[in-house]
Amino acid sequence: MSKLSNAQLKAFDEWLFDYRDIERKIAIRKLELQTPVSTDINVGGGKFNLVAKETEDIVIKWSKDGKIKSYENFRESVDRVKALLDDELNYIFDLRWGTGSNNTWEEIAYKIHTSRAGTYRKRDRILTLFAQQIGKL
């Protein structure tokens, strides 16, 4: 198994900060898609003979939208990684990338009573699992 470079570690670390806002991003995108725009294909014509199925149309838009798929894939990948982590690594994950958390790795080391090097090894483990989950390692 190859090892992640420092640049990759930093990139994945930054990327995981998006996890705290992923539900909001999905909800906003869904609202954008369901906001009505002019979909009248019968401009200037007479009677429109098709039954309007607004709910079905919205769900189809959601299921075909690339942005929503990307957000959901990211969320599912992170959730699978979290399922693989033990309690301590999950706690570290929440301290670093959880909602409302802005801890540095040094602050996390202090909070979990571990050396900085030990905390960085645990970070590397979490980020390596994430890289494997998304197919980058």
Q: What are the residue ranges of the model-derived segments?
A:
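Short amphipathic alpha helix immediately N-terminal
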Residues: L85-N103
